[in-house]
Amino acid sequence: AFPVGKVEFMEMHPMSFSEFLKAEGASNYDAYLGGLDQIEAVPDFFHVRLVEHLRRYFACGGMPEALGRWIETGDIAQVDKVLSDLLDSYERDFAKHGGRAQFAKLSQIWNSISTQLARENKKFVWGAVREGARAREYEDALEWLADAGLITSVRLNTGGGIPLSAYDDLKAFKVYCLDVGLLRRMARLDASAFAISDAIFSEFKGSFAENYVLQALLPQLDAAPRYWTNE
């Protein structure tokens, strides 16, 4: 029997940008950000350097081994090797769950994430998973990936009233990867892309930035995240 009331659960997330700053020896910048108590323009001196760190965070992500390899070597090729190994491990793990048919569905959804986010309309489209795919065929696999913590499904909210759930569009949602570094590697996007001015905010039509914001918010949220559109 499960020991009800005797087990404490803890959710694990990728390392945050704050932890990345500390790992890079930039605790002063982390302290500066932590001291902000209102929305205000960041002085150019801090802004330029924070964006430099953010570019590296987008490239490496927050998976502990990948971040550790970056701190140890400063070699993005070694970081890419770690990220590729992680992605390969996930795929191999899919094979253990539900037989060949379920493995195919898990892999197809997982490998479609970067393509889905690169679309002009970033709403999740089942047909982008496999031509002719329907929700009823793949919903169980999508739920498995979410329960495993590999993806986050974010519902479209059409209202803004209370409760938010009353205004959810149950047919429209976006799917994000657990980590921006894994997303970059999954998309086979070279880290040098983020060396270009503002590329971190524009690649994948801004979805890398969206994925980062969600990744930063999730450890702080006590409710399911939503998105809205003005279209």
What do the PLM-derived regions correspond to, one by one?
Residues 67-231:
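Accessory nucleic acid-recognition modules appended to NTPase machines
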Residues 2-118:
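Interdomain motor-coupling "hinge/lid" segment immediately C-terminal to the ATP-binding subdomain
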